[in-house]
């Protein structure tokens, strides 16, 4: 039976002003058949696995912190293709086009053997085991113990042309009407920051600012107790309208709870008891113990596990293998704006810490009669080894109004680098130039000298890798280049005895129809 109802729903109208549509780079970028191979040197770093080591006065850093649980953020600087002396200058028209790089493949090489490290704290806040306790746990004034464990296992890398965006939880500013009393838990908020080289990754205790939110300095291991652990904000980067921060990523994490402990100290949030809501919660969560029993004083409910990364195997490695970029997750399909590339890496499967012992007494080691631990100093060092290889494709950007409008809205400095602005003719072609401009005999120099281009990531710490002179057209001379030629079905051609800059696919003969 059909019954008529009056319109009781809302009417949604389109916006009064049109919303600008962001085009994918595939819609206006013209790709050429010119490919380059780029590779870095062997990148090595050595340091202490837990903290920075300073001199006796504390004013000079002697050994930096190098941990397998840190992020490594490589900032690869590429040459400007518009200033290349190309073998074939007819590839593009500089009056109507500009050249950019596109990433087609990469391989992150890692040296050193697989290994598991142990991290911990000499004053770790844990009170016995809560999984298999045979007696009721009692607390004292200081129950901290010297405890160590292995971290969560993580392999991950993120590739983009801007730094990777990370997220972590930090202390928030309380509202003005809420008087923050001493000893109360502060409000927390989620913050987004760039992941820099050396930032700690999550090792099983969460992505949090431990320096600001753990005053006891004993709830986590030494390598993160004074740090902020960050985790990539994949949700934010996946919804980026331009897709520059993350073209694609690979991730593998695993852990399991190995030990179960309880924290020492006074519980901040009490379990609801009879005094709540006029006795409504009486005996709702627990029944008190009898007098004379150890259970009379209820224990602490701050339970936590120590995780373990479990087995480290070469069967599940993300590194030392090629990755090919056919389609990125965002609108930027691998175009390296500003001729730079950011690779954020975390890998703690090669997490061995070297133990180095040094005899600290005068005389030869062979003269030692018996072992004395006080005569030896123990040191720890961690080493890392990287090598990065890229396959770059030369692409053309047409200088059309619609394309330039989107690029200007995305990053106006790109147009300045391309020198597209109108340069007026100087009023006077002859300018005055003083030789001794800083002497007392000449006038004062200009107080407002022309400013150099400011780095948009000034103040951020990255591992800079200069690849401006590390490009080659001879792809078949390199391991990653040969893999790319094979998987893409390309073969290198020769013109006039020199290597050509183009590749063509293999031609197959047409099959003849069989006569019946």
UniProtKB/Swiss-Prot annotation:
What the record says about family reads: Belongs to the papillomaviridae L1 protein family.
**Keyword field contains Disulfide bond:** yes
Q: Which InterPro entries match?
A: Capsid_L1_Papillomavir (IPR002210), Capsid_L1_sf_Papillomavir (IPR036973), dsDNA_vir_gr_I_capsid (IPR011222)
Record Pfam families = Late_protein_L1
Q: Per the UniProt entry, what are the Gene Ontology biological process annotations, in alphabetical order? A: endocytosis involved in viral entry into host cell; virion attachment to host cell
Give the HAMAP family listed for this entry. PPV_L1
Q: How does it assemble?
A: Self-assembles into homopentamers. The capsid has an icosahedral symmetry and consists of 72 capsomers, with each capsomer being a pentamer of L1. Interacts with the minor capsid protein L2; this interaction is necessary for viral genome encapsidation. Interacts with protein E2; this interaction enhances E2-dependent replication and transcription activation.
Localization per Swiss-Prot or TrEMBL: Virion; Host nucleus
| Name the UniProt record assigns to this protein | Major capsid protein L1
What's the main place this protein lives? virion
**Entry function:** Forms an icosahedral capsid with a T=7 symmetry and a 50 nm diameter. The capsid is composed of 72 pentamers linked to each other by disulfide bonds and associated with L2 proteins. Binds to heparan sulfate proteoglycans on cell surface of basal layer keratinocytes to provide initial virion attachment. This binding mediates a conformational change in the virus capsid that facilitates efficient infection. The virion enters the host cell via endocytosis. During virus trafficking, L1 protein dissociates from the viral DNA and the genomic DNA is released to the host nucleus.
Q: Which organism is it from?
A: Human papillomavirus 5
The residues forming a coiled coil are none
Q: Name one GO molecular function term.
A: structural molecule activity
Q: Which GO terms describe its cellular component?
A: host cell nucleus; T=7 icosahedral viral capsid
């Amino acid at each position: 039976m059909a019954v008529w109802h009056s319109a009781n729903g809302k009417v949604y109208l389109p916006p009064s002003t049109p919303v600008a549509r962001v085009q994918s780079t595939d819609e206006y970028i013209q790709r050429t058949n010119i490919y380059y191979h780029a590779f870095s040197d062997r990148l090595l770093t050595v340091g202490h696995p837990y903290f920075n080591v300073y001199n006796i006065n504390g004013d000079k850093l002697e050994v930096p912190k190098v941990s397998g649980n840190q992020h490594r953020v490589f900032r690869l600087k590429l040459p400007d293709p518009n200033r290349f002396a190309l073998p074939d200058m007819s590839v593009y028209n500089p009056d109507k086009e500009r050249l950019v790089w596109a990433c087609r493949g990469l391989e992150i090489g890692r040296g050193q053997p697989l290994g598991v490290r142990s991290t911990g704290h000499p004053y770790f806040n844990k009170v016995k085991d809560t999984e298999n306790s045979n007696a009721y746990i009692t607390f004292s004034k200081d129950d901290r113990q010297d405890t160590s464990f292995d971290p969560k296992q993580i392999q991950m890398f993120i590739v983009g042309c801007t730094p990777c965006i990370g997220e972590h939880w930090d202390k928030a500013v309380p509202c003005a009407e809420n008087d923050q009393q001493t000893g109360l838990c502060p409000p927390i908020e989620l913050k987004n920051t760039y992941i820099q080289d050396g930032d700690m990754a999550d090792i099983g205790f969460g992505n949090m600012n431990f320096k600001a939110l753990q005053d006891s300095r004993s709830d986590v291991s030494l390598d993160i107790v004074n740090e902020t652990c960050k985790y990539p904000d994949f949700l934010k980067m996946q919804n980026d309208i331009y897709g520059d921060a993350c073209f694609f990523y690979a991730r593998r994490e695993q852990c399991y709870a190995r030990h179960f402990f309880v924290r020492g100290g006074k519980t901040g949030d009490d379990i609801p008891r009879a005094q709540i809501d006029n006795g409504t919660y009486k005996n709702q969560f627990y029944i008190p113990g009898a007098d004379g029993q150890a259970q009379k004083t209820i224990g602490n409910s701050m339970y936590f596990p120590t995780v373990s990364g479990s087995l480290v195997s070469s069967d599940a490695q993300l590194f030392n293998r090629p990755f090919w970029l056919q389609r990125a997750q965002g609108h930027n399909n691998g175009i390296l704006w500003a001729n730079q590339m950011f690779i954020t890496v975390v890998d703690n499967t090669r997490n061995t810490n070297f133990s180095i012992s040094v005899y600290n007494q005068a005389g030869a080691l062979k003269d030692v009669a018996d072992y004395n631990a006080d005569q030896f100093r123990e040191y720890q060092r961690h080493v890392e080894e990287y090598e990065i290889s890229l396959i770059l494709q030369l692409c053309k950007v047409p200088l059309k109004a619609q394309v330039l409008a989107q690029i200007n809205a995305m990053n106006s400095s790109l147009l300045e680098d391309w020198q597209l602005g109108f340069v007026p003719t100087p009023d006077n072609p002859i300018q005055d130039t003083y030789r001794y401009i800083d002497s007392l005999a000449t006038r004062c120099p200009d107080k407002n000298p022309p400013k150099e281009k400011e780095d948009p990531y000034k103040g951020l710490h990255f591992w800079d890798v200069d690849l401006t002179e590390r490009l080659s057209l001879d792809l078949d001379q390199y391991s990653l280049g040969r893999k790319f030629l094979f998987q893409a079905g390309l073969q290198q051609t020769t013109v006039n005895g020199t290597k050509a800059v183009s590749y063509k696919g293999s031609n197959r003969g047409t099959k003849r129809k069989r006569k019946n």
